């Protein structure tokens, strides 16, 4: 109960601050070009942080949990990777004029977050951080 309350509080804080945390697969299927174009049109800027592990981790883990000895578990390629690699941040920049930045190393994250939030607050436009994680 306490953990759930804390989790809701964090979610509420992120929403009130205009921060969206999204996996790369969810980002692609959320029609990001429309999202960022509409945000620009209606002047509703937000910061979107994309967790980019290069594929669909949830379907992979679900399949392996249900069928650990199945044929797919032994396959070299499960077909859940994103190749060619999409330019997640570039989609938002092209469609909605968003500030776009790729964060390739953990040491860059803090300064990237500060710069992105400055753009959202000062320039009143969206910002997208494509945070690279270890691949699937």
Could you say what each language-model-derived stretch is?
Residues 1-136:
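Thiamine diphosphate
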């Amino acid at each position: 109960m306490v953990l759930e309350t804390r989790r809701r509080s964090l979610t509420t804080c992120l929403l009130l601050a205009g921060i969206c945390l999204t996996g790369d697969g969810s980002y692609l299927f959320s029609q990001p070009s429309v999202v960022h174009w509409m945000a620009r049109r209606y002047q509703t800027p937000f910061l979107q942080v994309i967790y980019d592990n290069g594929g669909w981790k949830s379907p992979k883990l679900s399949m392996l949990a249900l069928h650990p000895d199945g044929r797919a578990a032994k396959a070299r390629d499960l077909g859940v990777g994103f190749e060619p690699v999409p330019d997640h941040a570039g989609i938002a920049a092209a469609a909605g004029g968003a500030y776009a930045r790729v964060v390739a190393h953990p040491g860059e994250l803090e300064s990237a977050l500060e710069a992105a939030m400055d753009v959202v607050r000062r320039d009143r436009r969206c910002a997208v951080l494509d945070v690279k994680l270890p691949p699937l």
